[in-house]
């Protein structure tokens, strides 16, 4: 075994941990189908949200980690449940009243409310595929509608009929009495209306491959379970799909956790082997509620990319997948700055094992670009924007160029993008909420001390020396907690409760400019 393999197999980075589980489940053997299958799922009832991107990004991290541990071929499929009947109408789509007329219809049988594709489901699928393509994911797209209608699941659907009693014995204890009386794993597609029916099944015939139900008029209707004439309820469908496609690895949100045992048992009943599974925690909105495609209560991918590079979004997805995280606009600056820190550490680190533990290794699948920001962070640029209120990024570059003469927009495109992002973020989220603290007499003494200190130092003074001088002024002012001291300075000078290390900020903003800012508050 190579040293690289040894470092990878010992790594505690979660993608490698998951990859080792897959390798162990295979006993090192190539599956009969010739590859290891990774599956992600998508419910196209509403527009894809950032959680959909997150699941695919995480899945690829595990896939690439597995490829580092093994030379067994891999395949990633994105499976769209587009044959599901419409249960609720999303609030963030055009013409919701029109869509409401098609309740219980398969998503691929509803007209496209956006007027671009052959159906509502096709439109949602296209949106998913376009942004997966945009970010370079290599995947095969599977449509539930196509799989059912093309007969890909026919063999398994006949087996569900053959194992009908066993599956019902598994499922019924999970329901209330009222639901037990009507439940069946099969949902016929009504020959007249095309709706997905949740009706009691009066008769099932494995030999004929049919189920029989009563329509509203009391007539017995017999339909084949194959060829797209029936769909399985979502829990049996999950397990059936694992067995039919021979899925080796699947991850899903915590909302699936209670049913994971059922998925696995149904897969076994149908002769399959359940995949290795990872349950990730859900993203929460600003109110602590689960984000939802139908509600549209989350940041979209386009929203995030308006204010930050894609790598910061990938870092958010990488970090602690089994921990619930609040996903709103205020998490963006922190993730940008953490990405910069991890990137710099990666390129300073010579120990391969430590590189494997660095999130950027998994974000970039081992091919990590080197970025240079000269110590300038996104947060620092936001604060610089706050004091100079620039109309465009050229104003920020005026300060950046004085701080680091070797930096230019052409030679440092990452920093150039950050400057543009910072102005957008400031205008949309900070500017309207600035609230300045009027300095008290005590504050004015402090400000005068800072002004005197700035007048005495040379322009070449290092940031740490300036920071220490400001720190000493706070100590002399008699604050019990210096956090309160810095908070007061941020409120007086920047109009916000938090701010940068002032030594670094003053070096970027300039000593003379900072003197003018302080004088303005005196």
From Swiss-Prot:
The protein's name in its UniProt record: Lysine--tRNA ligase
HAMAP family recorded: Lys_tRNA_synth_class1
Gene: lysS
Locus of motif 'KMSKS' region: 290-294
Family: Belongs to the class-I aminoacyl-tRNA synthetase family.
GO terms under biological process: lysyl-tRNA aminoacylation
UniProt cross-references to InterPro entries, sorted A to Z: aa-tRNA-synth_I_codon-bd_sub2, aa-tRNA-synth_I_CS, aa_tRNA-synth_I_cd-bd_sf, Lys-tRNA-ligase, Rossmann-like_a/b/a_fold
Residues that, per the record, bind ATP: 293
